[in-house]
Amino acid sequence: MISLIGILIVFLTVFGGYMAAGGKLGIIIKSLPYEFTMIAGAAIGAFVLSNHTSGAKHTLKDIKKVFKGPHWQPGDYHDLLCLLFELIHLGRQNAVAQEEHIEMPESSAIFGRYPRILADYDAVEMICDTLRSASMNYDDPHQVEEVLEKRLEAQMHHAMHSTHALQTVADGLPALGIVAAVLGVIKTMSSIDQPPEILGKMIGGALVGTFLGVFLAYGIVGPFATRLKSVVEEDQNFYALIREVLVANLFNHATNICIEVGRQNAPGHVRPSFGDLESSLKSLKQAAE
């Protein structure tokens, strides 16, 4: 919703200010279809040219995140800590029983209690791979932390592709607007024998291209790229929390301490309160006994 409000403000202030200053929309509306076709068409073509097929599809899919916001909500962080508590607690009591859950998470009763997390491939794989490695005696906390950090960096690099692709388009739009404007000037020069009032309209129409390129770059596409980047970074905190808890587990801290390490490393606006989380953990512990 906030993104839609932002777009509305951009349009109202730009065109409202133009009309309030005495500008007429007629010349813009008349030239818009042709200028927009040239600029948008060239931008789309350059986008397709500079991205592989999967990258282009990934970018188009990610645009909806601009409006939907982060995938992971405060309740998901609470559920993640509860899930990790159950798995770590079970692993310390019965490693064989834990193995059944991490080898087949889709049929696990523990994972099944947290369907939003279970539906996320990256989160489930990160949890299961790390716990599986620990059961195979790859349990040096510093080495595991380094491996997880590299994994998160690779995941972040992939997730940021859409942001970079959109920003590249935004950076190129002003230049494409100039291209459209130059073509308009060339057209105008071929009619140099026309009266000044006609030439004025033709030059004004040509300048619509420059306006449109800059407007789309800094008013629409650029902010889209920035917003998408913030959403990706926000969601990445979810996976970083998994790393913090699982590394704390390898240091052989008490299970509750491992979870508290994760809770305190969660961003403040999504961090579960200590009381609510403690109450949930007590209920889970009682149910397991």
Language-model regions, residue ranges each:
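Alpha-helical transmembrane segments of integral membrane proteins
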Residues: 1-9, 34-38
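Helix-termination/interfacial motifs at the ends of transmembrane alpha-helices
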Residues: 5-8, 12-27, 147, 151-229
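Large intracellular
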Residues: 19-160, 234-289
